[in-house]
A protein has these predicted regions:
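Surface-exposed amphipathic alpha-helices with a cationic face
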Residues: 354-364, 393
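Catalytic His-Asp segment of secreted/periplasmic serine-dependent ester chemistry enzymes
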Residues: 373-446
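Positively charged n-region of N-terminal signal peptides that target proteins for export
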Residues: 3, 18-28
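N-terminal secretory targeting modules
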Residues: 12-15, 20-22, 44-264, 269-270, ...
Length: 446
Protein backbone atom coordinates (compact mmCIF):
# COMPACT_ATOMS: atom_id res chain seq x y z
CA UNK A 1 0.00 0.00 0.00
CA UNK A 2 2.74 2.47 0.95
CA UNK A 3 4.79 1.64 -2.17
CA UNK A 4 1.75 2.28 -4.37
CA UNK A 5 1.08 5.64 -2.72
CA UNK A 6 4.74 6.64 -3.09
CA UNK A 7 4.74 5.74 -6.79
CA UNK A 8 1.50 7.68 -7.34
CA UNK A 9 2.92 10.77 -5.60
CA UNK A 10 6.05 10.72 -7.77
CA UNK A 11 4.04 10.39 -10.96
CA UNK A 12 1.73 13.27 -9.96
CA UNK A 13 4.68 15.55 -9.27
CA UNK A 14 6.29 14.71 -12.63
CA UNK A 15 3.07 15.23 -14.62
CA UNK A 16 2.04 18.45 -12.89
CA UNK A 17 5.50 19.93 -13.15
CA UNK A 18 5.63 19.19 -16.89
CA UNK A 19 2.21 20.87 -17.34
CA UNK A 20 3.44 23.93 -15.47
CA UNK A 21 1.08 23.80 -12.50
CA UNK A 22 1.99 25.90 -9.51
CA UNK A 23 3.38 24.26 -6.37
CA UNK A 24 0.32 25.46 -4.45
CA UNK A 25 -2.00 23.44 -6.69
CA UNK A 26 0.32 20.45 -6.52
CA UNK A 27 0.31 20.57 -2.69
CA UNK A 28 -3.51 20.79 -2.57
CA UNK A 29 -3.91 17.79 -4.84
CA UNK A 30 -1.27 15.78 -2.95
CA UNK A 31 -3.04 16.51 0.35
CA UNK A 32 -6.25 15.12 -1.16
CA UNK A 33 -4.47 11.98 -2.42
CA UNK A 34 -2.76 11.35 0.90
CA UNK A 35 -6.00 11.83 2.85
CA UNK A 36 -7.81 9.29 0.66
CA UNK A 37 -4.86 6.88 0.96
CA UNK A 38 -4.74 7.13 4.74
CA UNK A 39 -8.50 6.60 5.01
CA UNK A 40 -8.21 3.50 2.81
CA UNK A 41 -5.28 2.14 4.82
CA UNK A 42 -7.17 2.66 8.09
CA UNK A 43 -10.21 0.86 6.75
CA UNK A 44 -8.08 -2.07 5.59
CA UNK A 45 -6.36 -2.26 8.95
CA UNK A 46 -9.64 -2.38 10.85
CA UNK A 47 -10.93 -5.16 8.57
CA UNK A 48 -7.89 -7.38 9.00
CA UNK A 49 -7.62 -6.73 12.75
CA UNK A 50 -4.04 -5.52 12.48
CA UNK A 51 -2.84 -2.62 14.59
CA UNK A 52 0.37 -0.75 15.23
CA UNK A 53 1.67 1.37 18.08
CA UNK A 54 4.16 4.19 18.30
CA UNK A 55 7.55 3.45 19.83
CA UNK A 56 8.01 4.44 23.45
CA UNK A 57 9.55 7.87 23.87
CA UNK A 58 12.71 8.54 25.84
CA UNK A 59 11.01 10.81 28.36
CA UNK A 60 7.60 11.86 29.60
CA UNK A 61 8.04 15.30 28.03
CA UNK A 62 8.75 13.79 24.61
CA UNK A 63 5.79 11.46 25.00
CA UNK A 64 3.43 14.35 25.69
CA UNK A 65 4.77 16.40 22.79
CA UNK A 66 4.18 13.51 20.40
CA UNK A 67 0.73 12.69 21.72
CA UNK A 68 -2.25 13.99 19.82
CA UNK A 69 -4.80 12.88 22.35
CA UNK A 70 -6.37 14.88 25.17
CA UNK A 71 -7.33 13.65 28.61
CA UNK A 72 -10.88 13.44 29.92
CA UNK A 73 -11.91 16.15 32.40
CA UNK A 74 -11.59 13.54 35.14
CA UNK A 75 -10.15 10.02 34.87
CA UNK A 76 -12.91 7.95 36.46
CA UNK A 77 -11.45 4.48 36.98
CA UNK A 78 -14.92 2.97 37.33
CA UNK A 79 -15.71 4.11 33.78
CA UNK A 80 -12.33 4.08 32.03
CA UNK A 81 -11.32 0.53 31.16
CA UNK A 82 -7.56 -0.03 31.16
CA UNK A 83 -6.15 -1.94 28.16
CA UNK A 84 -5.46 -5.57 29.03
CA UNK A 85 -1.70 -6.03 29.39
CA UNK A 86 0.56 -8.29 31.44
CA UNK A 87 0.72 -5.48 34.02
CA UNK A 88 -3.06 -5.48 34.41
CA UNK A 89 -3.36 -9.28 34.29
CA UNK A 90 -0.57 -9.96 36.81
CA UNK A 91 -1.08 -7.34 39.52
CA UNK A 92 1.16 -6.59 42.47
CA UNK A 93 0.95 -9.00 45.39
CA UNK A 94 3.33 -7.32 47.83
CA UNK A 95 3.59 -3.85 49.38
CA UNK A 96 7.38 -4.05 49.26
CA UNK A 97 8.88 -1.73 46.66
CA UNK A 98 11.33 -3.57 44.43
CA UNK A 99 12.34 -0.93 41.88
CA UNK A 100 15.92 -0.04 40.95
CA UNK A 101 17.60 2.85 42.75
CA UNK A 102 21.14 1.49 43.17
CA UNK A 103 23.74 -0.67 41.38
CA UNK A 104 25.82 -3.65 42.46
CA UNK A 105 29.33 -3.17 41.08
CA UNK A 106 30.26 -6.80 40.36
CA UNK A 107 29.28 -10.25 41.65
CA UNK A 108 30.07 -13.85 40.76
CA UNK A 109 27.51 -16.57 41.53
CA UNK A 110 25.92 -14.73 44.45
CA UNK A 111 22.55 -16.01 45.63
CA UNK A 112 20.08 -13.37 46.83
CA UNK A 113 17.04 -14.08 48.98
CA UNK A 114 14.13 -11.80 49.94
CA UNK A 115 11.11 -12.40 52.19
CA UNK A 116 8.09 -10.68 50.70
CA UNK A 117 4.81 -10.26 52.60
CA UNK A 118 1.90 -10.92 50.25
CA UNK A 119 -1.30 -8.92 49.94
CA UNK A 120 -3.48 -11.95 49.23
CA UNK A 121 -2.76 -15.49 50.39
CA UNK A 122 -3.55 -18.66 48.49
CA UNK A 123 -2.56 -20.32 45.24
CA UNK A 124 -1.93 -17.99 42.31
CA UNK A 125 -0.22 -17.94 38.97
CA UNK A 126 2.71 -15.52 39.19
CA UNK A 127 4.79 -13.70 36.63
CA UNK A 128 7.87 -11.60 37.45
CA UNK A 129 8.86 -8.43 35.59
CA UNK A 130 12.40 -7.02 35.25
CA UNK A 131 14.18 -3.96 33.85
CA UNK A 132 17.95 -3.67 33.53
CA UNK A 133 17.94 0.11 33.95
CA UNK A 134 18.08 2.33 37.05
CA UNK A 135 14.70 3.92 37.84
CA UNK A 136 15.77 6.83 40.04
CA UNK A 137 18.80 8.68 41.35
CA UNK A 138 20.38 7.59 44.62
CA UNK A 139 21.90 10.39 46.74
CA UNK A 140 24.01 12.56 44.43
CA UNK A 141 24.06 9.97 41.66
CA UNK A 142 27.68 8.85 41.96
CA UNK A 143 26.75 5.14 41.92
CA UNK A 144 23.24 5.14 40.49
CA UNK A 145 21.26 7.79 38.63
CA UNK A 146 18.01 7.89 36.70
CA UNK A 147 18.23 6.08 33.37
CA UNK A 148 21.65 4.54 34.01
CA UNK A 149 22.02 1.37 31.95
CA UNK A 150 22.57 -1.86 33.81
CA UNK A 151 25.49 -4.04 32.79
CA UNK A 152 25.38 -7.51 31.30
CA UNK A 153 24.55 -10.21 33.82
CA UNK A 154 23.51 -13.85 33.94
CA UNK A 155 20.76 -15.50 35.95
CA UNK A 156 21.82 -19.10 36.59
CA UNK A 157 18.93 -20.14 38.82
CA UNK A 158 15.74 -18.64 40.26
CA UNK A 159 13.03 -19.99 42.57
CA UNK A 160 10.02 -18.90 44.58
CA UNK A 161 9.06 -20.68 47.78
CA UNK A 162 6.91 -20.70 50.90
CA UNK A 163 8.99 -18.92 53.54
CA UNK A 164 6.80 -19.87 56.47
CA UNK A 165 5.88 -17.25 59.06
CA UNK A 166 9.41 -15.85 59.37
CA UNK A 167 13.10 -16.31 58.74
CA UNK A 168 13.38 -18.98 61.46
CA UNK A 169 10.94 -21.31 59.65
CA UNK A 170 11.99 -23.87 57.08
CA UNK A 171 11.65 -22.75 53.46
CA UNK A 172 9.37 -25.21 51.64
CA UNK A 173 7.71 -25.77 48.27
CA UNK A 174 10.62 -24.41 46.25
CA UNK A 175 9.38 -23.89 42.71
CA UNK A 176 11.69 -23.13 39.75
CA UNK A 177 11.27 -19.87 37.86
CA UNK A 178 12.21 -20.10 34.18
CA UNK A 179 12.76 -17.66 31.33
CA UNK A 180 11.59 -18.82 27.93
CA UNK A 181 11.61 -22.36 29.26
CA UNK A 182 15.23 -22.11 30.46
CA UNK A 183 16.62 -21.82 33.98
CA UNK A 184 19.49 -19.67 32.70
CA UNK A 185 19.02 -16.16 31.36
CA UNK A 186 21.64 -13.83 29.87
CA UNK A 187 20.53 -10.24 30.34
CA UNK A 188 21.66 -7.34 28.15
CA UNK A 189 22.03 -3.69 29.20
CA UNK A 190 18.66 -1.89 29.33
CA UNK A 191 16.79 -5.13 28.60
CA UNK A 192 13.26 -5.50 29.93
CA UNK A 193 12.04 -9.06 30.33
CA UNK A 194 9.61 -11.30 32.18
CA UNK A 195 9.71 -14.77 33.64
CA UNK A 196 7.51 -17.62 32.54
CA UNK A 197 4.41 -18.11 34.66
CA UNK A 198 4.70 -20.17 37.83
CA UNK A 199 2.00 -21.33 40.25
CA UNK A 200 2.59 -21.45 43.99
CA UNK A 201 0.46 -21.48 47.14
CA UNK A 202 1.36 -19.14 50.01
CA UNK A 203 -0.67 -20.07 53.12
CA UNK A 204 -2.21 -17.50 55.46
CA UNK A 205 0.44 -15.56 57.38
CA UNK A 206 3.36 -16.94 55.33
CA UNK A 207 5.97 -15.15 53.25
CA UNK A 208 6.73 -15.52 49.57
CA UNK A 209 10.49 -16.06 49.25
CA UNK A 210 12.24 -14.94 46.08
CA UNK A 211 15.70 -16.44 45.52
CA UNK A 212 18.06 -16.30 42.56
CA UNK A 213 21.74 -16.63 41.68
CA UNK A 214 23.32 -13.98 39.46
CA UNK A 215 26.72 -13.04 38.06
CA UNK A 216 27.73 -9.84 36.31
CA UNK A 217 28.61 -6.16 36.55
CA UNK A 218 26.59 -3.04 37.21
CA UNK A 219 23.41 -4.85 38.20
CA UNK A 220 20.52 -2.49 39.11
CA UNK A 221 19.09 -3.24 42.53
CA UNK A 222 16.96 -2.01 45.42
CA UNK A 223 18.34 -0.48 48.62
CA UNK A 224 15.86 -1.68 51.25
CA UNK A 225 17.00 0.28 54.32
CA UNK A 226 16.06 -2.59 56.67
CA UNK A 227 12.54 -2.86 55.29
CA UNK A 228 12.30 -6.65 55.07
CA UNK A 229 14.67 -9.63 55.28
CA UNK A 230 17.15 -9.48 52.41
CA UNK A 231 20.23 -11.69 52.44
CA UNK A 232 22.94 -13.00 50.14
CA UNK A 233 25.25 -16.00 50.01
CA UNK A 234 28.37 -16.91 48.07
CA UNK A 235 27.86 -20.65 48.56
CA UNK A 236 24.07 -20.96 48.67
CA UNK A 237 24.04 -22.14 52.30
CA UNK A 238 25.28 -19.39 54.62
CA UNK A 239 23.13 -16.28 54.12
CA UNK A 240 24.06 -12.89 55.55
CA UNK A 241 22.17 -9.60 55.67
CA UNK A 242 22.55 -7.36 52.63
CA UNK A 243 20.83 -4.05 51.99
CA UNK A 244 21.39 -3.98 48.23
CA UNK A 245 19.49 -6.69 46.39
CA UNK A 246 18.45 -7.14 42.75
CA UNK A 247 14.78 -8.10 42.51
CA UNK A 248 11.93 -8.25 39.99
CA UNK A 249 10.35 -4.81 39.53
CA UNK A 250 6.90 -6.36 39.84
CA UNK A 251 5.85 -9.42 41.83
CA UNK A 252 2.78 -10.04 39.71
CA UNK A 253 -0.04 -12.46 40.58
CA UNK A 254 -3.04 -13.34 38.45
CA UNK A 255 -5.73 -12.56 40.98
CA UNK A 256 -9.19 -11.03 40.75
CA UNK A 257 -9.30 -7.57 42.32
CA UNK A 258 -11.88 -4.78 42.24
CA UNK A 259 -9.35 -1.99 41.90
CA UNK A 260 -5.64 -1.36 41.42
CA UNK A 261 -3.73 1.33 43.33
CA UNK A 262 -0.10 2.34 42.79
CA UNK A 263 2.14 4.80 44.63
CA UNK A 264 5.19 6.53 43.18
CA UNK A 265 7.46 8.56 45.39
CA UNK A 266 10.61 8.49 47.51
CA UNK A 267 11.81 6.60 50.60
CA UNK A 268 8.83 7.85 52.62
CA UNK A 269 6.59 5.99 50.19
CA UNK A 270 8.96 3.03 50.09
CA UNK A 271 8.73 2.82 53.89
CA UNK A 272 12.42 3.09 54.73
CA UNK A 273 13.62 3.24 58.34
CA UNK A 274 10.41 1.89 59.81
CA UNK A 275 10.55 -1.08 62.17
CA UNK A 276 12.14 -4.17 60.61
CA UNK A 277 9.62 -6.61 59.08
CA UNK A 278 6.67 -4.87 60.77
CA UNK A 279 5.50 -3.12 57.58
CA UNK A 280 4.15 -0.13 59.51
CA UNK A 281 4.79 2.48 56.83
CA UNK A 282 1.78 4.38 55.54
CA UNK A 283 1.62 2.68 52.13
CA UNK A 284 1.48 -0.76 53.75
CA UNK A 285 -1.20 0.33 56.21
CA UNK A 286 -3.34 1.79 53.42
CA UNK A 287 -3.06 -1.53 51.59
CA UNK A 288 -4.07 -3.44 54.73
CA UNK A 289 -7.08 -1.22 55.39
CA UNK A 290 -8.31 -1.42 51.78
CA UNK A 291 -7.97 -5.21 51.80
CA UNK A 292 -6.97 -7.79 49.22
CA UNK A 293 -9.68 -6.66 46.77
CA UNK A 294 -7.35 -3.75 45.98
CA UNK A 295 -3.94 -4.58 44.49
CA UNK A 296 -1.34 -2.14 45.86
CA UNK A 297 1.81 -1.54 43.78
CA UNK A 298 4.48 0.34 45.76
CA UNK A 299 6.94 2.14 43.47
CA UNK A 300 8.53 4.37 46.10
CA UNK A 301 12.34 4.50 46.01
CA UNK A 302 14.86 6.01 48.40
CA UNK A 303 16.29 9.37 47.27
CA UNK A 304 13.90 9.61 44.30
CA UNK A 305 12.95 12.99 42.89
CA UNK A 306 9.96 14.15 40.87
CA UNK A 307 12.52 15.08 38.21
CA UNK A 308 13.50 11.38 38.02
CA UNK A 309 9.93 10.34 37.26
CA UNK A 310 9.75 12.95 34.49
CA UNK A 311 13.08 11.77 33.03
CA UNK A 312 12.25 8.05 33.14
CA UNK A 313 9.00 7.11 31.44
CA UNK A 314 9.66 3.41 32.08
CA UNK A 315 9.25 3.92 35.83
CA UNK A 316 6.24 6.20 35.47
CA UNK A 317 4.58 4.01 32.84
CA UNK A 318 4.52 1.07 35.26
CA UNK A 319 2.22 2.88 37.66
CA UNK A 320 0.15 4.26 34.78
CA UNK A 321 -1.18 0.73 34.22
CA UNK A 322 -3.08 1.05 37.53
CA UNK A 323 -6.54 2.55 38.09
CA UNK A 324 -5.43 5.05 40.74
CA UNK A 325 -1.96 6.48 41.36
CA UNK A 326 -0.64 8.25 44.46
CA UNK A 327 2.05 10.82 43.59
CA UNK A 328 4.20 11.74 46.60
CA UNK A 329 7.38 13.68 45.82
CA UNK A 330 9.11 16.84 46.97
CA UNK A 331 11.61 16.14 49.74
CA UNK A 332 14.61 15.09 47.64
CA UNK A 333 13.90 17.68 44.96
CA UNK A 334 14.28 20.27 47.73
CA UNK A 335 17.32 18.67 49.38
CA UNK A 336 19.32 17.50 46.36
CA UNK A 337 17.57 18.66 43.20
CA UNK A 338 17.77 17.19 39.74
CA UNK A 339 20.57 14.71 39.03
CA UNK A 340 23.80 16.63 38.32
CA UNK A 341 21.97 19.86 39.18
CA UNK A 342 21.41 21.99 42.23
CA UNK A 343 18.43 21.87 44.58
CA UNK A 344 15.21 22.60 42.76
CA UNK A 345 13.08 25.69 43.25
CA UNK A 346 9.40 25.47 44.15
CA UNK A 347 8.56 26.49 40.57
CA UNK A 348 10.75 23.75 39.09
CA UNK A 349 9.23 21.07 41.31
CA UNK A 350 5.78 22.40 40.44
CA UNK A 351 6.66 21.86 36.78
CA UNK A 352 7.78 18.27 37.38
CA UNK A 353 4.63 17.44 39.30
CA UNK A 354 2.47 19.06 36.65
CA UNK A 355 4.11 16.88 33.99
CA UNK A 356 3.62 13.72 36.06
CA UNK A 357 -0.04 14.40 36.81
CA UNK A 358 -0.71 15.38 33.20
CA UNK A 359 0.89 12.16 31.95
CA UNK A 360 -1.06 9.95 34.33
CA UNK A 361 -4.42 11.60 33.68
CA UNK A 362 -3.85 11.22 29.94
CA UNK A 363 -3.32 7.50 30.60
CA UNK A 364 -6.74 7.33 32.27
CA UNK A 365 -5.57 7.17 35.89
CA UNK A 366 -7.25 8.73 38.89
CA UNK A 367 -4.44 10.71 40.55
CA UNK A 368 -4.13 11.47 44.26
CA UNK A 369 -1.48 14.16 44.72
CA UNK A 370 0.29 14.47 48.08
CA UNK A 371 2.06 17.62 49.21
CA UNK A 372 5.60 17.60 50.64
CA UNK A 373 5.84 16.38 54.26
CA UNK A 374 7.67 18.19 57.10
CA UNK A 375 11.39 17.45 57.48
CA UNK A 376 12.56 19.83 60.23
CA UNK A 377 14.12 21.93 57.47
CA UNK A 378 15.98 25.14 58.18
CA UNK A 379 14.80 28.44 56.76
CA UNK A 380 15.89 28.13 53.12
CA UNK A 381 14.59 24.63 52.45
CA UNK A 382 11.46 25.21 54.53
CA UNK A 383 10.76 28.26 52.42
CA UNK A 384 10.92 26.12 49.27
CA UNK A 385 8.66 23.47 50.84
CA UNK A 386 6.11 26.05 51.96
CA UNK A 387 6.03 27.69 48.54
CA UNK A 388 5.71 24.31 46.83
CA UNK A 389 2.87 23.18 49.08
CA UNK A 390 0.97 26.36 48.27
CA UNK A 391 1.16 25.43 44.58
CA UNK A 392 0.25 21.73 44.75
CA UNK A 393 -3.54 22.05 45.27
CA UNK A 394 -3.72 24.10 42.06
CA UNK A 395 -2.01 21.30 40.11
CA UNK A 396 -4.60 18.84 41.38
CA UNK A 397 -7.41 21.24 40.51
CA UNK A 398 -6.00 21.83 37.01
CA UNK A 399 -6.26 18.13 36.13
CA UNK A 400 -9.28 17.40 38.34
CA UNK A 401 -7.06 15.11 40.40
CA UNK A 402 -7.50 14.53 44.14
CA UNK A 403 -5.42 16.41 46.72
CA UNK A 404 -4.21 14.89 50.01
CA UNK A 405 -2.79 17.12 52.75
CA UNK A 406 0.04 14.79 53.75
CA UNK A 407 1.97 17.58 55.46
CA UNK A 408 -0.78 18.63 57.88
CA UNK A 409 -1.14 15.07 59.18
CA UNK A 410 2.55 14.78 60.02
CA UNK A 411 3.04 18.16 61.71
CA UNK A 412 1.17 20.60 63.93
CA UNK A 413 -0.47 23.90 63.08
CA UNK A 414 1.79 25.68 65.56
CA UNK A 415 4.97 24.14 64.10
CA UNK A 416 4.26 23.15 60.48
CA UNK A 417 7.94 22.53 59.76
CA UNK A 418 8.35 19.97 62.56
CA UNK A 419 8.21 16.28 61.60
CA UNK A 420 6.16 14.95 64.53
CA UNK A 421 6.61 11.28 63.55
CA UNK A 422 10.12 11.61 62.13
CA UNK A 423 11.46 12.44 58.69
CA UNK A 424 10.53 8.92 57.67
CA UNK A 425 7.18 8.59 59.47
CA UNK A 426 7.13 5.76 62.02
CA UNK A 427 4.35 3.27 62.64
CA UNK A 428 2.23 5.78 64.53
CA UNK A 429 2.55 8.26 61.71
CA UNK A 430 1.75 5.50 59.23
CA UNK A 431 -1.52 4.82 61.05
CA UNK A 432 -2.45 8.53 61.11
CA UNK A 433 -1.87 8.81 57.36
CA UNK A 434 -3.63 5.55 56.46
CA UNK A 435 -6.69 6.37 58.59
CA UNK A 436 -7.05 9.81 57.01
CA UNK A 437 -6.46 8.48 53.50
CA UNK A 438 -9.08 5.75 53.76
CA UNK A 439 -11.55 8.16 55.34
CA UNK A 440 -11.10 10.62 52.48
CA UNK A 441 -10.79 8.23 49.54
CA UNK A 442 -12.08 4.85 50.72
CA UNK A 443 -15.28 5.08 48.68
CA UNK A 444 -13.21 5.13 45.48
CA UNK A 445 -12.16 1.54 46.11
CA UNK A 446 -15.48 -0.02 47.10
Amino acid sequence: MLRAVAALVINIINIYCVKGYSMKKIRIFLAFVLTVSLFTATACTSQTGESSSAADSQSVSQSQENSGSSSESEADSSQTAKPVTDYTTYVSNTVISTGNNFCIEEVENITYRAYLPVEEYGEFEYKFFFTNTVDSTYSKGKIAYVGKSGGSYTVSNATVADGGTGVEDEITNRTPVTFGGETKKDVKPDESYTSDTVTINIPEGHYLVWEWTVSGKGIPCTKMSTLTSTTSSSDGTQFNYCDEIPLPQLIGAKRNVKHTLAAIGDSITQGCQTEFMKYEFWASKISTQLGSDVAFFNCGLGWARASDAVANESWLSRVSEYDTVIVAFGTNDIVSGKYWGKKSTAEEIEGYLDTIVSYLTEKGCDVILFNAPPQDFKETNEGIRTALNEKIPAIAEKYEAKFFDFSALLSTEAEPEKAVYGGHPNGEGGTVVADAFVKQFGSMFE
